[in-house]
Amino acid sequence: YIKVSKFARNTYNEFITAIAKLKQAGCTSFVIDLRGNTGGYMDAAINMINEFMPEGRLIVYTEGKSFPRSDVYANGTGTCKDAPIVVLTDEISASASEIFSGAIQDNDRGTIIGRRTYGKGLVQTQMSLSDGSEMRLTIARYYTPSGRCIQKKYEMGNTDAYDQDIYNRYMHGEFDSADSIKMDDSLKYQTVGGRTVYGGGGIMPDIFIPRDTSGVTSYYSNVVNSGVLYLYALEYSDRHREKLGSFKTWEELYNYLQQQPLLSDFVNFAATKGIKRRPTLINISGKLIENQLQAY
């Protein structure tokens, strides 16, 4: 089992070290946990994928309206080309995580378990302007080996729908039931082995696992059903609107919120609204409450 929290500059070297230690201990198959991994350095993900691929297999390609297709293939030097692999994903897994899981799935090299990934797959270039500022221009998209576009749908000018996609997926029950996942029959693709996979943004898992509901307690149900959770999210946004509006990407916002004392602040707020503090139940539901607040 290897948990990859972020694709940083040194992630690949750490990954190789972990693989070597596991093999030395007798490990012959691997579970790669990408849950909560928002991406990072693309080269790190590609190098990791290469460890599991036979020579000549397509890993990923990029293509844009004015940007010619560019393919990346496995070079055959990987140390785990025949090792069984399982990849764990969730709705936060994004970007490089999706390239990794998409390549494994489309090449039939392993099984993807969890929930549909975020759907972030844009190629951007940075342009320096005369006033010293810089602009990031989207020039292409990332595609999995079968031809699936990783980037989720975006309608020009409709930023609200794009920004609220995760929340809408939650409200539609997609995190709790496989039946709530909408499969677009017009976006069917085939893996190397002939299995059908679906496009439409993000990577659909081979095996669906609903979100963990072990954190649902009477305290959690109370703050949700009373509307206090949503009310706090609105008031928090109003109090920190300037700061929250300063982030350029959702990853920056997510990382910022991860460092804030949201739970303790919320519990104090809920108490002013008549929700009694229940330390034991709060401890059980804490992570779930934090996730909900961040989603709002």
Q: Can you say where each PLM-predicted feature lies in the sequence?
A:
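A residue-level signal for beta-strand positions that form part of recognition/binding surfaces
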Residues: 1, 56, 134-136, 186, ...
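Cleft-lining beta-strand/loop regions that shape enzyme active-site pockets
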Residues: 1-132
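A broadly conserved detector of short glycine/acidic/proline-rich loop/turn motifs that flank catalytic sites
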Residues: 6, 91, 116, 139-143, ...
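General "foldedness" signal
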Residues: 13-18, 44-48, 66, 73, ...
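Generic detector of intrinsically disordered, low-complexity, polar/charged segments
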Residues: 23, 36-37, 73-75, 111, ...
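Polar, glycine-rich mid-to-C-terminal structural blocks
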Residues: 96, 108, 115, 119-187
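Conserved functional hotspot residues or short segments at active or partner-binding sites
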Residues: 149-150, 154-296
